[in-house]
């Protein structure tokens, strides 16, 4: 990494320019801290001796005379993207010319590459005495005159060339002014850019001093500004145009009382004495940084970007295509479905109702409103994608620029390359999906480039980065560190705010930070003056962002937004950690040098701190309590931060209490130890860094390292010191050796250990290691299950895994695998197969409804439990209900639970399981849900289990245990309603079918008798058993028994089951005045339906009538079958809708034809000009732009100029060909030269090849034709297209041609016709998918 001050050997030249006389008056050369002999040789100027010239040549190089000359050098340096660029008019002048001989002054103030133009203004002030507000700075770059701000008139850039001052013929107060500025003053806007661009490689700038105009005319100006109109002419026609740092009041003060400027406007005219003092201190500190930079880089460069010393914790990548791409973000939003992986999308666009934000989210989304309240500047779509619990955010703007951002844990130690690679892998599938949308997303063609494409620019910004200085300081040393930053604060390099925390030093680094959004100040001010709050900012702020220099309110907001990058330095036991927030990659490299030069100076050189302020290795060895624990977590957080993987895990400080935690050393630290000390260390592993780590146990009472198994969620072994050494052949010796070799201790290791050691059965209440057993609690084993088993059998609960990557509370999953004697992954694969069923939605009492299909549910099961690549979001417990149902389906196994609530046990069983238990055929498992985990219950013999883990987990009808469970289940359902068997007992009637809803509950029975139609008999929602009675998931049938047959059955039912008597309370009547059913009272309260009748049944005559405005069945049908074949009336409406919009479809084809005709012609003109131009000669460049202006507008010229400046000649023509220009949209003008009849004939000739004629229209689904594109390119299923041509009835085509011709010849219709580019019929009509929720907000 190069860190040099180029301005030391190629100094900045500042030439003063007098616009009144159009002459250059003096040049100041900023030499900086050069050797004394160089300074002396420079100042001799024309009296330099050969020795002086030799000194200058040795220092500045062979071209020293050019570097110290008065040439106006054009085309040097880097491009300043943020600055207003103006074409050099053909004035007969070349920019590389020698000026008349003028006075040259030499300044010892240093210029640095990290100086912004705001800094340059201050250094010009101390060198020349011209305060910042009087300076109009301009310079040349790439043959272009540039200034340090942007002046906009009605949104368009205003040409700013102070050399044209004398060309203005209108005067006020003796000064030339541009009167047109005053007449449009409300449309003027000044954007201050001084703080957002570095001087970089600009080595010659010019300054026009306002005083050269004002001082000679002060009396005349004073008189003129007494008149408001003349004042406005002066201010807007001259001052705001060239010296916008001045507010109207400040300009008036400058004219009337110039000596009061420093007092009234200290930011515009700072104290010269204070400024000189600060700049000299800044120069001293920055020169020191440059002097030490290369040495420090060489010392630390090997580790600077390595995983151990760098961690990117958040970042944003910006992808900027080199060509303009028009992307319809509204359509992308509409066509892109929300899924569990991409659970939320937000779009901002301009709809028919104004600025609109639409958000949609999958029902599994945990933050459905995220980003919906964001402030947008341009049409934008935001997508959030989850990969392995990590959220990635993609933001795409309508010009094709897009941004990718995410966050990472510091422990992941991502460097810049891995961040780019990770984000690229995330973005590629989404970009491919969007590109496949074709013209629906890209109405003018093109596609979004991938990050690997050569036609893009990539930048990394908004980064938060942690880096580590590999030395430690004592508390006194860290205090010394803080005090040394005070000089940097006095120099203005940093800013310290607020109270400081112990062990942390927090400040804002200001110097050289420039990558801000200049528009952010506007947004903040708009927020502060929104509805309901009084606006306390001067209205000039909205016109001029230099207001921070003359308005204290704006200054405070400016400092908040642009005050620097937040830096935090942490005092740690093992190193010094530095966090940098919201920085770019360029800023990281720059800040890293400043920070590490500062830190290295603490331990090297004449200013190094005292030895007793450095934290020694001995201090680490004698660390106590919290410091030891902190050192372990700092050096290996993956091992010691257990709750990173399981929020319920016991923390390390409890597992290994003081003074038992060991001391950890890195390999570098071990190398510096004496050989005798190294022999005492135990070699283990650093799980965070993936390298060896070494441990010692310094406390005399606990001198032996041991490794704890079964505590870490990922089965890592945890180091902890013990009193005694593990003896050979013991269990502890085996565990320690396994951990030191494999670094983990898992179930298989435990099984291996079982064959070597015997174990006792644990008491209930403790956490049960994998494959260990524990006794059942006394009240369950000895009371509830009394006499159900015989010795030597025992009841026990068996230890299983409790955690899994991507999901917490995984004990149930592992319990089911143990019960079924299956490998966990094999179980997941089998139940995933069972999940992929049309009735997936009934799983988990309707929890399956969260998914759009059984395939989606099956996929998520595999991703989570087999591949472990996903998370279950907020359904982290709902999955358990789904799994229990799937196990019941696959293995006919039902589970009951004993839940331990602090010693009080609750018996829990689902209604469907109760039904199974009460049926003749049953097979159950018993599971204990405790605070320590979820475990299966078993019957085993202790010795048998120790030998081969044999146990009984499943209980059937013949087991005594089943009798206990069955009696408990009967007790739980004793208050339930009649069961289906009761209905079976009514003579002459049988249950023909059970109707099941989407929550998998039975809601009605269809009773068969000797009639043709079944009786509809509702019941309270209840679980059902799988028996010989068919089940039906469809809607309530329409063909049902009459009231007479229904009432006959109810009468028999009431007679046999008086406790459940059905008593009607109201008659149900539909909107056709038909009687369709009744509502029952009492315990039932259910809707009984029968075949519609016009006659009120006699048995119901005295009851009130309840009108059903909408039949609930119709609502269910709309929900369950929204895409079924429409009613005939709907089909007629769709046909009419289609015919009414055929004209818009025809316009799409019409414009597509014109794009191909006209834009190709214009492009050929541009290509011919490009090939004939020598871009190395200014006269040839001027001729190129002059000719270009004959057939393209100013905005297109700006676009072409930007392409030529940012692209090498080899690729420039290719980029031009791909780009979209304004001339691509100016299509109708050539056609207006035709007569009406001629135009009709021409249009027929153009469009007939695009039309597929037909006689009549078939069924049309309206939902498919909201988004429409040319049939030539459409990638969507569009019913208006056939064979890539538009389908139009023969009798309509002639009419449309006449309408189109009339519209083209009508100038008032131009904008209406061009609106078809929107690509939608109704921009607020969106595709409705299952599992998606859409909300719309207007933004005003």
From Swiss-Prot:
Q: Which UniProt keywords apply?
A: Transcription, Transcription regulation, Virion
User: Is Chaperone among this UniProt entry's keywords?
Assistant: no
Q: What is its main location?
A: virion
Quote a single Gene Ontology cellular component term: virion component
Highest taxon in the source lineage: Viruses
Please indicate if the UniProt record lists DNA-binding as a keyword.
Answer: no
Could you tell me where this protein is found in the cell? Virion
Of which family is this protein a member? Belongs to the asfivirus G1340L family.
Q: What does this protein do?
A: Putative initation factor.
**What's the name of the protein?**
Early transcription factor large subunit homolog
Its source organism is African swine fever virus (isolate Warthog/Namibia/Wart80/1980) (ASFV)
The uppermost taxa in this organism's lineage are:
Viruses, Varidnaviria, Bamfordvirae, Nucleocytoviricota, Pokkesviricetes
């Amino acid at each position: 990494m190069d860190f040099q001050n180029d301005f030391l050997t190629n100094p900045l030249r500042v030439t003063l320019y007098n616009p009144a006389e159009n002459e250059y008056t003096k040049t100041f050369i900023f030499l900086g801290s050069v050797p004394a002999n160089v300074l002396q040789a420079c100042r001799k100027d024309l009296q330099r001796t050969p020795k002086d010239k030799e000194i200058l040549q040795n220092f500045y190089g062979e071209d020293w005379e050019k570097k110290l000359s008065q040439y106006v050098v054009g085309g040097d340096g880097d491009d300043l993207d943020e600055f207003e660029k103006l074409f050099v008019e053909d004035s007969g002048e070349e920019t590389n010319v020698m000026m008349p001989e003028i006075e040259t002054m030499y300044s010892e103030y240093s210029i640095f590459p990290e100086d912004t133009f705001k800094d340059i203004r201050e250094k010009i002030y101390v060198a020349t005495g011209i305060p910042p507000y009087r300076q109009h700075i301009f310079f040349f770059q790439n043959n272009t005159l540039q200034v340090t701000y942007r002046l906009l008139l009605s949104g368009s850039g205003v040409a700013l060339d102070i050399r044209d001052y004398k060309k203005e013929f209108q005067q006020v107060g003796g000064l030339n002014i541009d009167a047109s500025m005053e007449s449009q003053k409300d449309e003027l806007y000044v954007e201050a850019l001084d703080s957002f661009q570095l001087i970089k490689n600009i080595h010659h700038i010019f300054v026009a001093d306002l005083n050269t105009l004002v001082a000679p005319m002060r009396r005349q100006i004073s008189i003129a500004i007494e008149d408001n109109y003349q004042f406005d002419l002066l201010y807007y026609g001259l001052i705001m145009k060239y010296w916008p740092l001045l507010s109207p009041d400040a300009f008036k003060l400058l004219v009337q009382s110039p000596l009061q400027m420093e007092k009234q406007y200290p930011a515009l005219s700072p104290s010269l004495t204070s400024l000189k003092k600060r700049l000299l201190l800044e120069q001293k500190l920055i020169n020191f940084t440059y002097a030490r930079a290369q040495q420090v880089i060489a010392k630390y460069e090997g580790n600077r970007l390595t995983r151990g010393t760098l961690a990117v914790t958040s970042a944003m990548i910006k992808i900027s295509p080199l060509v303009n791409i028009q992307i319809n973000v509204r359509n992308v939003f509409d066509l892109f479905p929300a899924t569990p992986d991409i659970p939320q999308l937000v779009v901002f666009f301009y709809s028919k109702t104004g600025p609109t934000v639409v958000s949609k989210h999958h029902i599994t989304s945990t933050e459905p409103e995220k980003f919906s309240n964001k402030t947008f500047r341009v049409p934008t779509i935001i997508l959030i994608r989850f990969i392995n619990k990590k959220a990635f955010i993609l933001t795409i703007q309508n010009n094709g620029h897009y941004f990718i951002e995410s966050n990472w844990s510091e422990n992941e130690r991502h460097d810049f390359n891995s961040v780019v690679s990770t984000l690229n892998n995330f973005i590629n599938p989404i970009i491919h999906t969007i590109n496949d949308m074709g013209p629906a997303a890209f109405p003018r063609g093109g596609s979004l480039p991938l990050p690997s494409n050569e036609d893009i620019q990539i930048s990394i910004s908004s980064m938060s980065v942690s880096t580590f200085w590999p030395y430690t300081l004592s508390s006194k040393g860290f205090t010394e560190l803080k005090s040394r930053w005070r000089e940097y604060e006095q120099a203005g390099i940093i800013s310290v705010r607020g109270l400081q925390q112990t062990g942390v030093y927090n400040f804002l680094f200001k110097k050289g930070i420039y990558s801000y959004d200049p528009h952010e100040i506007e947004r903040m001010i708009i927020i502060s003056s929104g509805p309901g709050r009084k606006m306390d900012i001067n209205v000039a702020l909205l016109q001029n962002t230099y207001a921070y220099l003359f308005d204290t309110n704006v200054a405070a907001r400016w400092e908040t937004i642009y005050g620097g990058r937040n830096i935090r330095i942490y005092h740690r036991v093992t190193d010094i950690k530095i966090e940098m927030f919201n920085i770019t990659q360029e800023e990281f490299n720059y800040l890293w040098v400043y920070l590490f030069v500062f830190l290295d100076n603490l331990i090297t050189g004449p200013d190094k701190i005292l030895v007793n302020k450095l934290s020694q290795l001995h201090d680490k060895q004698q660390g106590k309590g919290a410091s030891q624990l902190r050192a372990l977590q700092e050096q290996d957080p993956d091992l010691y931060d257990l709750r990173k993987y399981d929020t319920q895990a016991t923390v390390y400080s409890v597992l290994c209490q003081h003074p038992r935690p060991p001391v950890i050393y890195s390999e570098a630290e071990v190398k510096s130890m004496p050989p005798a000390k190294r022999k005492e260390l135990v070699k283990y592993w650093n799980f965070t860094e993936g390298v060896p780590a070494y441990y010692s146990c310094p406390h005399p009472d606990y001198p032996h390292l041991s490794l704890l198994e079964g505590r870490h969620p990922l089965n890592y072994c945890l180091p902890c010191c013990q009193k005694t050494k593990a003896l050979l052949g013991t269990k502890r010796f085996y565990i320690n050796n396994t951990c030191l070799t494999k670094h983990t201790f898992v179930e298989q290791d435990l099984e291996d250990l079982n064959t070597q050691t015997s174990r006792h059965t644990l008491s209930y209440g403790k956490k049960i290691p994998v494959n260990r057993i524990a006794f059942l609690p006394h009240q369950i084993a000895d009371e509830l299950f009394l006499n159900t088993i015989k010795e030597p059998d025992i009841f026990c609960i068996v230890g299983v895994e409790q955690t899994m990557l991507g999901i917490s509370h995984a004990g149930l999953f592992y319990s089911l695998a143990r019960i079924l004697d299956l490998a966990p992954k094999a179980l997941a694969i089998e139940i995933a197969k069972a999940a992929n069923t049309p009735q997936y939605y009934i799983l988990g009492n309707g929890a399956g409804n969260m998914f759009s299909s059984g395939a989606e549910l099956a996929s998520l099961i595999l991703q989570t439990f087999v591949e472990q690549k996903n998370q279950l979001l907020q359904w982290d417990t709902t999955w358990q209900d789904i799994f229990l149902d799937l196990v019941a389906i696959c293995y006919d196994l039902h589970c009951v639970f004993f839940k331990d609530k602090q010693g009080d046990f609750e018996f829990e069983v689902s209604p469907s399981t109760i039904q199974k238990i009460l049926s003749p055929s049953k097979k159950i498992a018993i599971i204990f849900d405790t605070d320590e985990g979820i475990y299966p219950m078993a019957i085993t013999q202790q010795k048998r289990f120790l030998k081969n883990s044999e146990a009984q987990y499943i209980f059937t009808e013949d087991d005594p245990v089943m009798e206990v469970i069955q009696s408990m289940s009967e007790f739980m359902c004793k208050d339930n309603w009649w069961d289906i068997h009761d209905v079976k007992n009514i003579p002459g009637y049988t249950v023909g079918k059970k109707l099941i809803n989407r929550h998998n509950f039975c809601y009605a029975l269809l009773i068969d008798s000797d009639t043709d139609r079944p009786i509809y008999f509702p019941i309270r929602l209840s679980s059902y058993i799988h028996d010989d009675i068919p089940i039906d998931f469809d809607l309530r049938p329409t063909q049902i028994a009459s009231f007479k047959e229904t009432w006959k059955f109810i009468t028999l039912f009431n007679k046999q089951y008086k406790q459940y008597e059905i008593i009607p309370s109201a008659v149900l009547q539909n909107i056709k005045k038909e009687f369709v059913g009744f509502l029952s009272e009492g315990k039932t309260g259910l809707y009984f339906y029968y075949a519609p009748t016009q006659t009120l049944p006699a048995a119901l005559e005295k009851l009130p009538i309840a009108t059903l405005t909408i039949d609930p069945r119709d609502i269910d049908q709309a929900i369950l079958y929204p895409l079924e074949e429409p009613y005939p009336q709907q089909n007629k409406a769709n046909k009419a809708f289609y015919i009414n919009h055929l004209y818009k479809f025809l316009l799409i084809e019409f414009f597509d034809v014109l794009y191909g005709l006209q834009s190709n012609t214009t492009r050929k003109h541009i290509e011919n000009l490009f090939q004939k131009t020598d871009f190395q000669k200014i006269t040839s460049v001027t001729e190129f732009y002059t000719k270009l202006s004959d057939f393209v507008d100013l905005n297109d010229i700006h676009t072409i100029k930007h392409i030529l400046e940012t692209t090498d000649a080899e690729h420039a023509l290719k980029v031009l060909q791909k780009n979209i220009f304004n001339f691509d949209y100016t299509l109708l003008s050539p056609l207006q030269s035709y007569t009406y009849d001629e135009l009709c004939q021409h249009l027929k000739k153009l469009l007939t090849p695009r039309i597929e004629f037909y006689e009549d229209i078939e069924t049309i689904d309206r939902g498919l034709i909201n988004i429409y594109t040319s049939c030539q390119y459409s990638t969507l299923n569009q019913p208006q297209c056939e064979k890539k041509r538009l389908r139009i009835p023969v009798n309509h085509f002639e009419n449309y041609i006449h309408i189109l011709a009339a519209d083209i010849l009508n100038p008032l219709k131009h904008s209406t016709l061009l609106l078809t580019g929107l690509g939608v019929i109704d921009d607020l009509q969106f595709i409705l998918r299952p599992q998606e929720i859409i909300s719309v907000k207007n933004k005003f």
